[in-house]
Amino acid sequence: LHHYDGAISPQEIMREYIDALPSGSYVALSHFLDPQTEEHSELARRMEETFLHSPMGTGRFRTRDEIEGMMAGLELVDPGLTLCADWWPDGPRIKPLPPVSYCIAGAVGRKP
């Protein structure tokens, strides 16, 4: 949905998708994130502008609240909505994250 820029809200699209799933289903979502910090929001705005002028034509960075709204009605699995880079299976991070890693988040949710 991070490349979707249509008339229907992404929250409505996800609501319809989630409603069609049986109870007990899991939904995984990753999305471009505007982290709402001075340093990283500026990077998100520059990347969004780059996407607009690329063959993709779109790339929308949404806030944490907007992304969480796409998962409404789901029980988020720990750690909830977090930076994708924080889903590390190999132990603690050794090097600092590159700035772009602060601009994509993901979550997994279970439909009750």
Q: Which functions belong to the PLM regions below?
A:
Residues 1-112:
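Alpha-helical subdomain
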